[in-house]
């Protein structure tokens, strides 16, 4: 029985082709629709009803648009259109179809005899049903050839009737052969009962060129058209001119095309999908609350199949954190389910439906659960980009901007599809801008592209926004004049174009001067924004007053680049303005997620989240160190959300949105103080107290108070913060053991989850300590005593490298006073020496004089306290623990505190490392590599000392500067785990460098 025969039966179930539907769902996902691949494609298994924490309710028939269907979908005869697979075409028609094309199909080429006017689809391209070409299955396939121009094969209207409120999936196998420019796709359109196409009711698969391979493509048709009666399918081979690439810009363009080649289609299936919806019901799907948001779940299936439905929640790491299995005996269900989530963050909810353990429907939802927004917080330079040219985003824009925790936003008001009617008073776009202005959002207007109509009128490329505004023609005035009139007094920043410019500095300056003159009639003192590639050297002449250079970052940069570009810009700006702060220009930075936000890869997402946070913090830090006001900088996040495909599309936020909110909440209004060094390999930044928003404030009872007043300052956070992360990736976190205040502090991750870290008292001396775990992703420690941390960080040994030679070594202990008052106290050097050993075992091989160092420091004074060190010649090289116990009287009498550092014992003129290996005969071979780091010839003696046999000696004579020598030792009695000491002696000196190597 053919595929066609199997699926024209009235009682068709998904049957053996449910797997095909599953594959089509995944193909539809890859196409960028509202469903996409998940970390676990397994289908819902049957689970006991009591494992589901959610109680579902049936939708009353009278309240639903599908009330026309019987209450029992299994009762009576069911038409084919009510089955899971509505229609299937396998093109196996050789036995009964004498026509050159499949039954029920027609060649939709341009034909004046029909008449059918269809430019680009010449009549000489005729689709056929082919039995000799390789088919995906069987022998039949639909072939669409080209001899120049595009080709179409269209299903006659009335062939497939549908339910108006049901969703459908169209899947096909496609293969192209001999094509270079042309591509293939499947199109589906909805028709009304008269066979007339419904406006806007068209869906397509992606255009593909498979280069001879079979590929599955799929599309989804949403049941949002109440007058839909039929679905019409069109198979297409499209040349570039028909692929939608032109945007109607150049009517005289010469298009490349193929003059030979074919597209083949096979196993075309039209299947009815369950109606699935899942949402938070909140604009932008951002929930700001102390409790997890309830998810609104809708399941409706009209096929009569026994379905199993489940909802699963995944976190940013791809871990399943919550699940609900819906009772499988209901087919029209609605529920509000509140998942038990582990903390604030970004989550992906997956609602899937299966029949006989085969996936037949899936919907996903990306949402954010974040902490409630804090009133009066100044987000500083943090900003976000919102595409108001997308109506769905525009509708949610106020909530999206609020949910990202910022008080600044760049809003896209023009793109190529902008219509003139959307730019007049009372339009949805203008109303949204009004809402943002009234919410006191500091806006930057972005004209990303010229509207198509304007670009066509001027015969220019739509990306040439700046040249058009700088030109003599006033053609832009009807498009931008009303917006400039309306918002010129409230908006200072205006961006013309949204891609990094390639123009020379001279050309740009001329254009910017003309634009500035044109805008002065609308905007007092406009700040004109110029996008600039981050890897392009900054032109000093562009750093002028009333100019903002907006650096466009890309995913290949690291956080180390941020301070470099800020320093480069600052130097140029000062040189151009003779250092006058009131005339300095502005600098912006645009950051984007480095991952594809629609797809699933937990490792990629988390890496992107951490990388973006480090970049943002590094830019904020470098900008703050310039001493300029935050108003001189913009740190913009873009590509922060996406809109799911389809008429029911909703805004899906990226994980970076909640990261941005966390950074804006904690860093906005703060100033950089100092980068400190307490733990090797850990980035440590100390920032000061946070200021409230600069504008006037209103209390909860409605009373007005001015910024800086006692009432306003009473709510300010006077404590500082530390920002910590590992400089390099590590499987294990590093623990900082240090008192950073005299009370509990709070650690916040990038999703603003708070962990309270109590001040512990440890050991017999009851030393205060906070234990702070530090990973690659930044954490923010709040409640920090910044003077105390800076003081402890200033205590260090200089030089911090001990030379491996006999005798007394002269060093100093440095420390400084960050308080505005005089401080005093004592330092005790307790390691090296064993004075921290709980059993009291003192290490006499180290001599340090004096071990007790009293100090008195005036405000901002730095002191060096001299000490002498001596140690045994047998001391092993490498890192050594250096510990200070600190007594301090400053702004308070602090308890005895311990500071732990590391110092290195080595020799500056030598690099040595040793390895051990076992040969096949059991002999242990120790290899020693010695490199001369000085610019003079050196001579060495090597001694290898095993535990159970005689020591061996080797010489290295005349090793030249920069050269390396290798010597080997063989031992017959060494066992696994034995430590072999290798001593390197520089001839005619007291230098002795000792290393140990472990026998494997």
Region roles according to the model:
Residues 464-496, 507-522, 540-542, 615-617:
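An active-site-proximal structural segment forming one wall of the substrate-binding cleft
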Residues 39-342, 352-364, 371-388, 419-420, ...:
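Extracellular and organelle-lumenal recognition/adhesion modules and their flexible linkers in secreted
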Residues 589-591, 600-685, 689:
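Aromatic/acidic polysaccharide-binding cleft in carbohydrate-active enzymes
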Residues 343-366, 787-793, 806-809, 872-906, ...:
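Terminal connector regions
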Residues 396-403, 409-464, 505-534, 563-566:
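Aromatic-lined substrate-binding rim segments of carbohydrate-active enzymes
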Residues 679-743, 823:
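Carbohydrate-binding surface patches
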Residues 477-507, 534-536, 545-554, 585-593, ...:
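Active-site groove signature of glycoside hydrolases
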Residues 761-796:
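C-terminal beta-strand-rich structural cap/linker in extracellular carbohydrate-active enzymes
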